[in-house]
Design a protein with these regions (language model features):
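N-terminal, active-site-proximal structural segment of metallo-dependent hydrolase catalytic domains
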Residues: 1-49, 62-68, 262-291
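Surface-exposed cleft-lining segments at the edges of enzyme active sites
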Residues: 84-87, 111-129, 162-167
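Active-site beta-strand/loop signature of hydrolases that rely on acidic residues for catalysis
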Residues: 3-7, 22-42, 106, 135-155, ...
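Structured beta-strand-rich core segments of catalytic domains in phosphoester-bond hydrolases
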Residues: 36-38, 42-114
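Short proline/glycine-enriched turn/loop segments at secondary-structure junctions
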Residues: 209-211, 240-246
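Conserved beta strand-loop-helix elements of the APE1-like EEP
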Residues: 63-79, 197, 209-230, 256-257
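Metal-dependent phosphoesterases centered on the DNase I-like endonuclease/exonuclease/phosphatase
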Residues: 51-53, 128-218, 276
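Short amphipathic alpha-helices and their capping/turn segments at secondary-structure boundaries
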Residues: 18-23, 95-102, 130-141
Length: 291
């Protein structure tokens, strides 16, 4: 079973890339984030195309912001929209969707950005993550928790850790919250597979960050131990970040039981740019966006 997660940063803008990508990579389960439209519009836009490809789907959206979806060719049952008992800002946002797919409880997540440390939104992010941990801990043994976590797990997951000092995504409380989630019995399967490699999933649109390979690894697939033992490949589909009109995030793909493309990775294709040796000015878009 192939499971993928992708922050598409507006599904309406990404349709010309999403559908060919589904045909090329043939994932069995896809978690999407940042739909930026309602579930009704999602269905009007993609419903027939997905059904023609054998996908059932569920979405939770809101106009212009946030939004998550799960597409599945291996069953889609027990759909739970929203983070049960989770906090709002001020109301619950379209950030979490769970369903059972092929016997695995799958969570598609768009974790709050946090915006600025010590802000109300930052506190909301930490409270949201604490509630997520409770939900996952109470869930079934076979689980995948994935999406845009808006946290780089370690300094190795940031192109220039010094550039992010004082910003969200890398603070100790955020990483502690992520580690508490992992302590529920989850494994960071990409990092497990590639413990010493430079791996990113997000590159700011500006300042040539993608071509310089100045990115962050904030899109994660976390798997419970029974599922993690089935992993045969785990990689970032960097090809989907190239070309015209991409999302600023690349899909992350995990293959269970069999690996159709072999044990490839960590980023496919690998970047041609050498790691930046000097300080690179940090674009602000990811830090101050509404997410």
């Amino acid at each position: 079973m192939r499971i993928a997660t992708w922050n598409v940063n507006s599904v309406k803008q990404r349709v010309p890339r999403l559908l060919p990508w589904l045909d090329q990579r043939a994932p069995d389960v896809v978690c999407l984030q940042e739909l930026k439209l309602t579930e009704d519009v999602f269905g009007e836009l993609l419903g027939s195309e997905l059904e023609a490809r054998g996908y059932e789907w569920a979405a939770l959206g809101e106009k212009s912001w946030n939004g998550v979806a799960i597409l599945s060719r291996v069953g889609l049952t027990d759909v739970t929209p929203g983070l049960e008992g989770g906090p709002g800002f001020p109301h619950q946002e379209a950030r979490a969707l769970a369903a059972t797919c092929g016997g695995v409880r799958v969570h598609s997540l768009y974790v709050p950005n946090g915006r600025v440390p010590d802000s109300d939104h930052y506190a909301y992010k930490l409270e949201w993550l604490a509630r997520l941990r409770e939900v996952v801990a109470a869930g079934p043994a076979d689980a995948v928790v994935c999406g845009d976590m808006n946290i780089a797990p370690a300094d190795a997951d940031v192109f220039d850790p010094a550039a992010y000092v004082g910003h969200t995504h890398v603070t100790a409380p955020e990483r502690d919250a992520l580690n508490a989630l992992l302590a529920c019995g989850l494994r960071d399967v990409v990092r497990d597979r590639w413990p010493d490699e430079r791996v990113f999933t997000y590159w700011d649109y500006r300042a040539g960050m993608f071509h310089k390979d100045c990115g962050m690894r904030i899109d994660l697939i976390l798997a419970s131990e029974p599922v993690a033992k089935r992993v045969e490949a785990a990689w970032v589909d960097r090809q989907a970040r190239k070309g015209t009109g991409p999302s600023d995030h690349a899909p992350v793909i995990v293959d269970l039981d069999t690996a159709p493309d072999g044990d490839i990775g960590p980023m496919v294709p690998p970047p041609s740019a050498r790691p930046s040796r000097g300080r690179t000015k940090l674009p602000q878009a990811k830090i101050v966006d509404r997410g």
